[in-house]
Regions:
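His/Asp/Glu-rich, glycine-adjacent segments
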Residues: 60-200, 205-208, 333, 339-393, ...
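Active-site-proximal N-terminal segment of extracellular/periplasmic enzymes that hydrolyze or transfer
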Residues: 1-44, 483
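Secreted, luminal/periplasmic, and some membrane-associated catalytic domains
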Residues: 49, 54-55, 77-105, 222-230, ...
Length: 492
């Protein structure tokens, strides 16, 4: 293998909501000329698998921390913690990051031992990151402008202004002497939600992002540091088009009349029988009391019980693609209308499955009835790498392993709902019309670009958790253990 290339600074960009197939198509066609010339031409543009849930916030963590959000106990952009007693008291037990004070909430919610790029890279400035642990206040370039820019963009319906703000903040960081920057560019995601992921308005967002990227590359060249700067562009998730909105709470109330749901938390806050926390609008964590109360977990396979009734009702609804639940500790079921896929992860320990390959543990995979993920027959036992390789070209890439990682979170719901493509799970209280959704295991949600101004030297399937250790290695910095991804060498 050729000698790995080294850099002494980094510009890491997360283009929120950018879908792999759209980026590949536009770059190949020359509509994103900077990505084509500076990344595709040198072998630096690849597809990567994101994480489940494929939503902003949790899906930012692989780049920022090298961890799947399940390991950081973040099962969604909204989640809850089950009540401790028999009554359904959810006071102070719910969370939404679609609200002010995201960094403070994430600082409290993510386990204390989780470290970020800001801890590892000296002189790293932040632009629009959600999780800023380890970043000095002086290095937070958008601490105040982020919220102001969002409100202005919402009022004027000019979501391109968010990317203009991000570009200006990156330039400002360099002017203030910061050698490295980690930046989130939000516009593609907002445009995709508003107009649809492949609308002309959203495609124009991709083109304008590429123009911003070109200006930033030009500034690095003008400063004489482009060759020494690792430039990395990725995303947290894609989107699929949405034509029908369904309220998951309405589907639950015939079985659980006292269902708690955002933002009307005052209803049943102290006496809920169930709670629904929607993320990305295509995925929801449902929390359900057992037959004897909240001190008991629901049993979805006990005939005649309310959990089984809800499962059957949801599976028969046209908006629902998959339901996921724990059959037993370490055994997870993904149910469709005509069959179930069962993942047995009992052999996977707390630190097993690390991306460095030091723990090549195997998970079990069996199908009852028809395979709800549509896979060709798979081996009954697979390593993490085998799961990634064998499912890469399917409609649900890396699905079995994503369940293993997701259920590491104690906050994960009792029942996980994934909407069918074209539908979502939230019909009220959105700040703008939603014609694009994400959060589920769908290919369009899970596959994102991973671009570097170098050449990837490893052709194994790539995931976004690989980017954190890859950045550290490329900068000559030590890579901590226990990560969800592995370092991938980069060539010239």
């Amino acid at each position: 293998m050729p000698e790995a290339r080294r850099f002494d600074r980094v510009l890491a960009i997360l283009a929120d909501g950018a879908r792999w197939d759209v980026v590949e198509r536009l770059a190949t066609a020359g509509e994103m000329p900077n990505l084509r010339q500076q990344f595709l031409a040198c072998g630096g543009l690849r597809c990567a698998t994101s994480v489940f849930p494929s939503v902003s916030g949790p899906a930012h963590l692989p780049l920022l921390t090298g961890l799947h959000p399940g390991r950081a106990n973040l099962p969604g952009i909204r989640w809850a913690e089950r009540p401790l007693g028999k009554r359904g008291n959810f006071l102070f037990r719910t969370r939404s990051y679609v609200a002010p004070w995201r960094p403070a909430k994430l600082e409290r919610d993510v386990p204390e031992g989780v470290r970020t790029l800001f801890h590892h890279i000296q002189g790293l400035a932040d632009v629009n990151s959600w999780f800023v642990r380890g970043c000095p206040l002086a290095a937070r370039m958008t601490r105040f402008s982020k919220g102001v820019t969002f409100v202005k963009a919402w009022v004027t319906a000019d979501w391109h202004a968010e990317n203009a703000q991000a570009e200006a903040a990156v330039q400002r960081a360099w002017q203030r002497g910061f050698s490295s920057v980690c930046a989130v560019f939000p516009a593609i995601d907002e445009l995709g939600h508003r107009f649809g992921p492949e609308s002309e308005q959203t495609l124009e967002g991709y083109r304008r992002f590429d123009a911003s990227l070109g200006r930033l590359l030009g500034e690095l060249h003008r400063r004489g540091v482009l060759a020494r700067t690792l430039v990395l562009v990725t995303s947290d998730h894609g989107q699929s088009a949405t034509h029908t909105h369904v309220d998951i709470g309405d589907l639950m109330r015939p079985v659980y009349p006292r269902t708690l749901i955002y933002p009307t938390l005052w209803r049943h806050l102290f006496s809920a029988q169930a709670a629904a926390m929607v993320s990305g609008n295509s995925m929801a964590n449902l929390y359900l009391q057992g037959e004897a109360g909240w001190h008991e977990r629901p049993d979805f396979e006990a005939a005649g019980g309310r959990p089984a009734e809800l499962l059957a009702r949801l599976l028969n609804h046209p908006a629902i693609a998959h339901l996921i639940y724990r059959r037993a500790p370490g055994i997870y079921v993904l149910a469709g209308r005509t069959g179930r896929a069962v993942v047995d992860a009992r052999s996977v320990g707390a630190d097993d499955g690390s991306g460095d390959g030091s723990q090549p543990v195997r998970i079990g995979f069996t199908v009852e009835g028809e395979n709800p993920l549509g896979y060709a027959p798979l081996p009954g036992q697979m390593t993490r790498d085998e799961v990634a390789a064998l499912t890469a070209g399917t409609g649900f890439p890396d699905g079995p392993w994503q369940l293993v990682e997701f259920f590491r979170s104690p906050r994960a719901g009792d029942l996980i709902v994934c909407a069918r493509a074209g539908f979502d799970l939230r019909s009220h209280f959105e700040y703008q019309p939603h014609n694009g959704s994400h959060g589920a295991l769908e290919r369009e949600h899970m596959l994102v670009p991973a671009a570097v101004n170098a050449r990837w030297l490893d052709d194994r399937p790539l995931c976004t958790a690989d980017l954190f250790p890859t950045i550290l290695s490329a900068l000559g910095l030590p890579v901590p253990g226990g990560l969800s991804g592995r370092s991938v060498p980069l060539g010239g």
